Design a protein with these regions (language model features):
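Stable alpha-helical elements in mature extracytoplasmic
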Residues: 1, 37, 58-62, 66, ...
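C-terminal solvent-exposed extensions
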Residues: 32-33, 91-152
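Flexible, polar/acidic helix-loop-strand segments at domain edges
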Residues: 3-79
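Sec-exported extracytoplasmic/periplasmic mature domains
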Residues: 3-10, 46, 64-75, 89-93, ...
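Second-shell loop/turn segments in exported
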Residues: 45-54, 70-75, 87-94, 126-137
Length: 152
């Protein structure tokens, strides 16, 4: 994925990686390339409860930066979306066609974008593993808000 856009610059959101990777200090602007992108998006301290939540935050930051960079590349070359699809094909299983991906990239380029949200709940320490307990009432409300339109 990182090869398809080149380097991406992000701001490190927290110190969750700093013990193993001092370059990832909270507030530091870092350039992600093939040598460090995987560390940024996949690493977590499995000895620290709820470290997966911090990792998810870094993944969201990476995806936003990736989309911004892809939009720039698409603005320079309308064929970029097709090139991206071809570059990703060996690493993915999808029913999204190349034409559909091109349309998705075009909609992002037109600032139609998307709304990002997290399933409401809280992380707790279980007997053996971290657990995420969903707030069922809040999830129901968010589901109705997101997927249903009131008849008038």
């Amino acid at each position: 994925l990182s090869k398809s856009v080149g380097v991406i610059t992000v701001t490190v959101p927290d110190d969750s990686l700093v013990d193993q990777h001092p370059e990832f200090t909270a507030g530091t602007e870092v350039t992600l390339d093939e040598s460090n992108t995987e560390i940024f998006v996949r690493s977590r301290d499995t000895e620290t409860s709820q470290s997966a939540i911090a990792r998810l935050g870094r993944q969201k930051i990476y995806i936003r930066a990736f989309v911004d960079k892809a939009k720039e590349l698409y603005a320079e070359d309308a064929g970029y979306a097709a090139k991206l699809y071809q570059a990703l094909t060996p690493y993915m299983v999808t029913n999204i066609s190349q034409d559909r991906l091109v349309k998705l990239v075009q909609s992002i380029d037109q600032d139609k974008g998307y709304e990002e949200w997290t399933i409401p709940g809280e992380g707790i320490q279980g007997k053996e593993y971290d657990e995420y307990v969903v707030d069922d009432d809040a999830l129901y409300e968010k589901t109705v808000e997101t997927f249903y339109v009131e008849k008038k």
